[in-house]
Amino acid sequence: MSNESSQLAASSRLPTTTNQVKTVITDTPFVSTALEERRSRSLRARPSLSSPSMGIPSTTHPNGHATQSKGMEAISQGLRQEAVIVRREKRITEKERELKEVVESHDGLIREKFHLERFVTLLEGWNPEQAKLDNSPVFLQWKDSKHNLLNLLPDEPAISASSQAGPSRPRSSLPSRTTRRKAHEQSELLAHVVAPVAKPPAFAPSTKGKERVGDELHAKTKGKGKGLAEQSLIPSPAEGALHTKGGKRKVGDVTTDMLPPPVPDKRSRGSRRATMGAPLPQIDQNEEVGLDSQATHGGKAKRRGRISLPDLPTSKKLRTAKRASAVSSESASPVVEAPTLERLASPSPLSTPVPLPTFAHLPFPPAPHRIRKRIVGPRTIRYTDPSQRPPAPKYGGDITPIIESYVNINDTGPPPEMKTLEARAKKEGYLLARVMYLKSHGRLQRLVDEEDGSNLFSTTTTSNSHAKIIRIPPRKTDYHDTLIAHMVQVRNAMLNVAKSKPVTCKKVARMVQAYWENIEGKEERERLAEEKERRRMGKEIIKSLRKRWALAVKVVRAKILEAQKQEQDRLGKEHLQNILQRSTGLLEAQIQGSNDSGEEEGEDSTSDNTDDSEGDDETNTLLPLTSISPEPVIGDDEEDVDVHDDDDEQQGEEDTSHKEDESDASDTESDENSMSEHNQDLRFLISDDVLNEDPMSTGRFAEEDRGSSDTEQLTDNKNDGEEPKETAVQAAFDGSDDVNRLEEPHNPVSSTANIGNFALLESSSAEVSDASCPATMPILVRQSPKTCSQPRTRKVKLSTLSLSSDPDPDINDPEFKARLEDSNQDDQDEELDLEMEEADSAGRESGEGNRDSEDEGLLADADLPIEVLLRRYGYPVPEGEGAVNGEPEQSESKGREQAAPTSTVSETLPSTKLSLAQPANQTDQSLTDTALPEPRVPEQLIISGKRQRRKKEIWTPDDSEPQHLVGKKRIKKVEIVEKVEADVHQNGDGLVIVEEETMGDEDNDDSKVGQEEEDGHEYDSEEEYDEDEDEEEEGAKEDNVDWDDRQDKEGDIGPRVRQPFLLRGTLRPYQQAGLEWLASLWSNNMNGILADEMGLGKTIQTIALLGHLACDKGVWGQHLIIVPTSVILNWEMEFKKFLPGMKVLTYYGNQKERKEKRVGWHTENTWQVCITSYQIVLADQHIFRRKNWCYMILDEAHNIKNFRSQRWQTLLGFKAQRRLLLTGTPLQNNLMELWSLLYFLMPGGIGADATAVVGFANHKEFMEWFSNPMDKAIETGDAMDEETLETVAKLHTLLRPFILRRLKSEVETQLPGKFEHVVYCRLSKRQRFLYDEFMSRASTHEALTTGGYLGVMNTLMQLRKVCNHPDLFEMRPVKTSFAMDNVARDFEPSDILIRKRLLAEEDERRIDALAIGFGVAHNEAMSGWVARARQTYDASDKLPYAASPLRRGKLSAPPPKDTRSVELWLKYRVWAEEEFSKRRWESIRATNRQRCGISPIYGSTFLSLLGNLPNFLLPQDVQSRREETFADFTPPAAKFITSLPERAKSLEDVIDRFAVIPPNAVARNLATYALPGLEPISHPALTDPAFDTLHRSSVKLQIAFPDASLLQYDCGKLQKLFEMLRDLKSEGHRVLIFTQMTRVLDILEMFLSHNGHRYLRLDGSTKIEDRQVLTERFNSDSRIFVFIASSRSGGVGINLTGADTVFFYDSDWNPSMDRQCMDRAHRIGQTREVHIYRFVSSHTVEENMLRKAEQKRLLDKMVIQEGGFNNDWWGRVGWKDMFGDVPGITDVSGVVEKSGEGIIDIQVEGTPVAEDVEVTRPRAGEERELARALAEVEDEEDAQAARMAQGEGELDLQEFEEGPKAVAKRVRVFEPENSGTPVTTEAGETGDVVEEYDDEPGSVEEYMLKWVEEDWDYFSPYRA
């Protein structure tokens, strides 16, 4: 526990003498004033003086001892106990009253705040008296928690019982120990809490000098429990010490206590010194700490810390009992007012202050004893200078008169008594004595300004501190001081000499020792150096060995990489061969399908009418019963996969039974080879697990056993009633025969790929149950016309078979997951799914009872005539149904009665329809060599692109006997017959594939009749139904003939695929052929690219395809069409115009509109076709990914030519059964763009086995196979070698099944021709100068040499500007003359100007020419007789005061101006008024006389007479004054007199020709100098341009504009264009001009206006609604001669067939853009031949651009056009010749030598000329970089037009522009990979070394290489 705290606690219980001392001191006026001044300072609590020996120091006055004794006596008299008690009671009463007022005021404010916060004032109003009565618990709790003054102090912790108690306080009052620092900190905090004063934050010194006390209430300490002691010092307010034992513990007045002083900041040197900041070691802490307690309690008190002052250093004096007893009656320091612990424990202001001890108890300590060495004897002070004498004391050493004369201003009352003044003086003297005592001991150094800040915290002695307080006055040095200083210097020199000698000796000794040590350790050092050298050599050897081994590893690695490369090349070649074989097989299937369709239809039209006729609109579909799910709800993918795996096993069994039953049923084939030949044409359509399965395998028997059990189950269920029949009927309407293929996204760049995933679309029906249908029983489904026109709502479950364990391509996509989680739309979709599922389930429940009625309705429909059914379901009724080819209908009916009711599929299903899904662990072998067809073409079983036939019978389980195949002689077809026999032991699935032979035997007829008898009436109704269908088919067979025979025999025979009846309008022949090709893609499960040239109707063909699928296939969607934003509405209008039966959803708009359009998104019949844009499909990709699209169609598919774009990657992940790309330019820049399109169609890739080909080639393989060789061949321009021709042929073979491209010249015979010409134009003189000057610039040379791409493109753009027009590069300047104001006049001194101005104004003011009569000619407008008459009538003399009266004598003096009397003032006023009137009338009379006396010199009459002479000469346009005079006579010379305007007009040509060169400098304001004094602004006529005749010539000489004709003559292209436009206009042609730059359009506008041609303009700034108006106006108005447009905005989407001549002012890098511009005029609707002229500046960069464009055209010609990707190719080239020699590209031996100017014709549709020029191979992806660089360097207008065009054509293309990093990455990817080993230069050198040691067998290198090869697993991870 703290000793100081205990002593302070005990001080409150001292005798009353102590309290009296304190009270007297406090109440003394002077002392109280001093206390008030020092209340902001906190001094430590200390005892009072008890010894009178310690008085006031005598340094202030010689008589200080006498004054001190008198003051002490006065103080002693005032310290009586009675006076102290009276003053104390009075003070207590006052403080209690003040405290009560404070508490009442505080309580009132708190209550008002409570009412405001609780809004009580607003309800009841504020009443202070009523608020005082509010003592509710809520208020008391709120007041206690927030505004209780007692809570401001921290709680006092519990004091342990074991704490020691000091002699001055109880044991339980305070903690065990408190240091001075802690006590001081607590005193500071308590002082701020009890009496807060606005003080800046201060820092109190701590033990380490770095603790910051400041504003922190709880300082953190690191001592032994000091933190706890600090917290325990502050007592709890709840413990309040007001009522203590015996009432002795009282707390003094807070307001009278001295506040803690601000702690100084140690960082500020200029601040005051901290209290006790320099602790003095001479003060014994025993004296300072425990004197009071020892005196009171017998010297047994412990040391206590000081509260308000920091720690003092402990004195080194011994603390003995004797010392303690000796000073027991002494005190360390007097007590100063400060908050004590008693006050803290009892914060109540009602307590009495702690009394101060008396002087007797607390004497001053003696002065510290200092031992000083002094000079013995008296010291004589000698002054060597008068200034050294001390100054005389002020005021004569006596300040009594000054004190007596002191008067206090505040003392307004009577002067105090002498006793009161003496008491005050005693108190103040006491305080001053204490202060001086403390200063002498260094205790109050903080109150002293210290000049030297460096000694702020220094620990100096007491004498030094005292010396700083009482400074010795400065004096000058004398002789004695100099002598002492010299002695000090000599002494220092002697010491230095004494120190230097040992140092020198040590240096010498050290050198000798080093010498001997060097000799002694020489051998050891040499040994260590040798050892170090050996280690170094060993490390070098090891390093060289490692390097050698690393070299060996590199060589072996290079060999292995080379072997891997060779193996990869081999596998790649095999892969390419497999891909080519697959393409061949697919194309073979298409060709044979078309041929078979033609043959079949031809035979049908000429064969006997007794043949069974199948319907055109109903199809037979064989589906296992397990594929019909009883609950058709889209569930989890895992469940789908499990179900599908079961289907795979069952279908595998069925395929095995197909083969065996077919072998048994065939009469013409007896061995397996024959069967293999018969079925080899189905290898591309049937899975390889069926083709390659061994019939004798054990697995087959196991499956047969299971099939047998299934057959038994089927037999058992035969007698269950009509349930199987009902199931078949329901399946006929709800089933689907489509087998869908889902393509999952695949990494195109990866070298490995998964096997393609096929999905089987399973038919699901709510009415079919597993209990009533066997698991493996197949059923025949008939699809009625109702299914086509009114499709039923059904759920389709997709099961994906893939090698991947994840069937969903988006299931592992984190971005897709995040979007699904964050998307609110997905939650709505899920809710919609649940609602729709509930609706479907409810429909299924309600439909269970209506099943029988529906079946009866279907059977009733079978009895209706075919005409009624056709009308009911929307089919047109054909004419001529009764007979075909002249045969009666009865014969046909008779033949149908003889036909067997077999289950026949007349049209072979597509590849995936008949193919059974292969297991996930098997590899597709359908495209291997063993699966390829033989060269011999057997009778085909594939009918591709033909309409499906209607099944005429439905099989029922009532058939107990096996069905036999009967029929007439027709082409062989595949018939799938359901065979149910109980005793069949070969297989049990009942599926037999047999070949239908010639029909004519009686046995077959008999068997058929027997079968009909068993079937009963059901077959009768079906036969009647089929008769009507046969009639319809016979009527339609007239149009169904072979497509190839149409061109040779009849031109009006119907197509294979009929035009959908929902399609309005008639397709053109080539459009019908395109529809058939698209239908064949669907039938063969293929994707394709419709790449017809622009203007051939790709949109209508696509719409027709969707109509065909809906009408003929029953596939209504849903389809997704992605188009550019600008043509969304165009597609919608095309659908409404040609196919209004399809429900179309145009998905566009903002987010809210799209959300509204997604209402019913999952409802099947809400819409069938969704049309959206590329931008929206990316924004809502998470919505589109979730749907399984039937057909995904991409318009303008070249938008996905970049496989790195987000658009390509996003669309690749969509689920779609089929994909179709529409583009007019499938190949624009390079082959890799074509690869992007093809890979998008076939994203399968390569599997683990190179022979398992299920998809397309990856990026690297395609580049190595095709891109690199063909690019090299195109760029070199040499003749095609055999290898290149073979590569081209392979590429054609690869692309032919997937691309259909027709040119307008091929399909539109009536379309006029198109001819292209290149016009070479010479550069003008100015163009050549600018071109050469730009090329010779250093900056241009630097840009070309450094190779910076942007710099090169900027150079290219500037050169193109020069070639187009020099004004684009540098405008002709408008020349003006240099003109400025007079410089000398502007710089004249201001004072001269001021003087001139003042003088001018003075002259004008003083001199008035008119007033003095100097205006001689001013009155010439007046007539003479008027002036004379005016003088006659002058009446000036008649005015008042005109005649002055005669006066005699002197004039009377004027009266004086006297204001003292009224009479004199009135007299003066009368006189003044009279004088003023006289002067006024005199002025009026003089003015009147002057005005009446004015007269002209000649007069207007005389001048008019002289001006009207009849003989003067004037111009004819001047109006004469006397017209009657001129009518009499006109001078003969008058016509030669011209006016000034006429003269200026006649000289306009001369002025225009010669006033063209303005002078270099001209002078201004010549009129001012020529006519000084004439201000033009005062005469408006002078500023009128009509008045200024020389205005035109002056302006021509001031500014010179370029001549308008220079616009044409400065440019060679415009000169040529002027000539050609003149000729074309005379011949009646109309012109279309395209350019890339918007500024060129401005120049063309000026050019056309200058030459008088009418034109229209269209650029990027033209609004979309105005474009259609412009095009229609140009096409309809033949007066408009020219239409100018930018190629970027006018090249897409407009029709300009009114023009027959197209000019390309500049060429584009991409030739496909120019072709699009050409097609604006050369399209359907053009009636004249179209000529295209391309302007090229000779000997410029444009020639190289044209050459590069020709290379791209050549590449497109070789790859696309010569490939023959059209329908005619099938007729020209047989399918056997697909691998034959393909005619190569014609080699052009020579190139026409271009002259400087001329026109060269180019064969537009032929092969472009490959010029033999040396051109470096362009970087891959150059076109995109080029377009971006051109956009950066071209003009702002062109860039703006390009952006707007891009937004119209490709609205969202700019979002997928790749940055520089992506471009650099793309360049690295596109760089051709080296075919050699990737060995560095060092590896190459190693190869030479190996060859060098080849002649030495067994060399080290061979050994190392052999070792590395043998143990390659160990060396493979090693890297040098």
UniProtKB/Swiss-Prot annotation:
It catalyses: ATP + H2O = ADP + phosphate + H(+). GO terms for biological process: chromatin remodeling. Residues 1613-1766 form the Helicase C-terminal domain. Gene3D superfamilies: P-loop containing nucleotide triphosphate hydrolases, SWI2/SNF2 ATPases, N-terminal domain, Tandem AAA-ATPase domain. GO terms for cellular component: Swr1 complex. Residues 597-619, 634-654, 662-674, 823-840, 994-1005, 1012-1036 have a biased composition (Acidic residues). A motif (DEAH box) lies at residues 1195-1198. Its EC number is 3.6.4.12. ATP binds at residues 1092-1099. It is found in: Nucleus. Residues 1-68, 158-350, 590-727, 783-862, 876-966, 988-1055 are annotated as: Disordered. SUPFAM superfamilies: P-loop containing nucleoside triphosphate hydrolases. Residues 1-31, 56-68, 900-929 have a biased composition (Polar residues). Its main location: nucleus. Residues 167-177, 324-339 have a biased composition (Low complexity). Residues 467-540 form the HSA domain. It holds the Pfam family HSA. InterPro entries: Helicase_ATP-bd (IPR014001), Helicase_C-like (IPR001650), HSA_dom (IPR014012), INO80/SWR1_helicase (IPR050520), P-loop_NTPase (IPR027417), SNF2-like_sf (IPR038718), SNF2/RAD54-like_C (IPR049730), SNF2_N (IPR000330). Belongs to the SNF2/RAD54 helicase family. SWR1 subfamily. This is Helicase SWR1. It comes from Cryptococcus neoformans var. neoformans serotype D (strain JEC21 / ATCC MYA-565).
